[in-house]
Amino acid sequence: MKGSFKRLIAIFMLFLHMVSLADGIVPDNGVSKNLQLDKTANGVPLVNIEAPDNNGISHNVYKEYNVDGRGTILNNSKDLTNSQLGGLIYGNPNLQNSSEASTIINEVSGVNRSRIEGYQEIAGKKANYILVNPNGIYVNGADLSILEM
């Protein structure tokens, strides 16, 4: 009986650890006040990036930034646009009073490394893309698509 309970606890801890690795994308709302997460009709995570500054740089800060096999879309479009991963997506509400970004910086402020295991797509205007994580970035089966519509 005692051994079964220990095994049960060990299995629970293993799954708990796996869940923590799959946190996905978690904005750091203390820094990125307008960064918004959504999903497309087919379930692909959609990030409405922050409006760019006067130099065209959209700086987005996350506690966690992980991309699973479904991929992730970074919405850099003011208008309705078509994406490879998610089909038709609406315009980014953060860009309605500004231009689209020419550079997108995704910075991780949390303590975990990023796991990039799927496609990342910039939908809308083409932009340079920078992912910064001082804890490291694990890449497996990743790609970056930059579409201009």
Describe every region a protein language model picked out.
Residues 21-149:
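Solvent-exposed adhesion/ligand-recognition segments of exported proteins
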